[in-house]
């Protein structure tokens, strides 16, 4: 991982076009295998990720048919927006975007941009702004995600 030598990444962060598309089939196959191994279907699946993991949750989860029960992205971003908005796939899962206002790695404005793309597509989007938080997850954001997931897994 370029940013953190002890970190992990799904794709080279400098390749935000080809990287997600190359990682997508690997992730989709992993999800399918795990669902099958545990005898579950997509309505029991939630995708939750941080940073690049959040980016890939959005990338894959919004393209899944049937969709997962919900997606939560902490400090992530919506990649390949033009390609996604050209899709006419419905239904979409509900999405929660949680982001710190002081994030220097994945700027807060990217959450606002994602909302501007997703809502016109008919995606139900819940946003959680974390004032003063940098690139991370705090207890209030974690609590918000747990409430969001509980609400959408009860359906």
Where are these regions (language model features)?
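Hydrolases whose catalytic domains are alpha/beta-hydrolase-1, hotdog thioesterase
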Residues: 56-60, 82
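Short beta-strand immediately N-terminal to the catalytic nucleophile in serine-hydrolase-like folds
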Residues: 47-49, 74, 98
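A conserved short beta-strand
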Residues: 66-79
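Short beta-strand/loop motif that positions the catalytic acidic residue
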Residues: 96-99, 103
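C-terminal catalytic histidine-bearing segment of alpha/beta-hydrolase fold enzymes
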Residues: 109-155
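Serine-hydrolase catalytic machinery in alpha/beta-hydrolase-like enzymes
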Residues: 1-44
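Gly/Ala-rich beta-loop-alpha elbow adjacent to hydrolase catalytic centers
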Residues: 48-53, 57
């Amino acid at each position: 991982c370029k940013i953190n030598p002890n970190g992990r990444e799904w794709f080279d962060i400098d390749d935000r076009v080809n990287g997600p598309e190359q990682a997508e089939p690997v992730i989709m196959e992993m999800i399918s295998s795990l669902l099958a191994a545990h005898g579950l279907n997509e309505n029991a699946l939630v995708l939750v990720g941080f940073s690049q993991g959040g980016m890939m949750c959005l990338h894959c989860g919004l393209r899944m048919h049937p969709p997962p029960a919900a997606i939560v992205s902490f400090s992530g971003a919506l990649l390949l927006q033009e390609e996604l908005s050209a899709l006419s796939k419905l239904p979409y899962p509900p999405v929660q975007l949680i982001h710190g206002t002081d994030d220097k790695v994945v700027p807060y404005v990217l959450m606002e941009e994602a909302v501007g793309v997703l809502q016109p597509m008919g995606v139900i989007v819940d946003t959680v702004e974390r004032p003063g938080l940098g690139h991370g997850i705090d207890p209030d954001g974690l609590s918000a995600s747990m409430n969001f997931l509980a609400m959408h897994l009860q359906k």
